[in-house]
């Protein structure tokens, strides 16, 4: 009897060339599929909630797969964690309806971009946060971040490629910049994201910090629908997929 399983995993993306399998490159999906093969002796078709790029991390990454194997979800979880490397972990495994799809059933995601704001770098955060030397005024950046809220055409905040053809409108439901000690976090949630959208948003907020823009420039950048108007693309190391939303969670 066919079953559909939802697995939630997390990973440190530092050592991987993103989620998706690539020829001659180590990917999270490739390593995960090898662990699945060790456990099930077969290769299920994995449906992922998203595709993270090289060096991007995930605190919650969801995938679904249909199985005819009768292994209980809790046993599959334990067996996968046995075969997976220390920088990937399965958090949960549960049966879901057959029509559930990790990507197409998703109604939103939350990302967090982490910035270590201290003149001295932290060796423990290398590859896990952006190191920014000069003091960040989180209140000014939070003011700028409020302008991302709502439904907008985010053409100015994406890298164009064949993954993003068509509608560039996304609805941002959460956008804030906060500080906890020396760690500054940009948190943003939306019904969907364009390619490099969060990293370009972050780069633009840092450009506000540097005086290239003022918070009130953000609406003009959005309205311009031109990538050249926004700030640079922030490095991948500070980006985390924080949460994936499915009904009725949102």
At which residue positions do the language-model features occur?
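Structured-RNA-binding interfaces characteristic of tRNA pseudouridine synthases
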Residues: 1-250
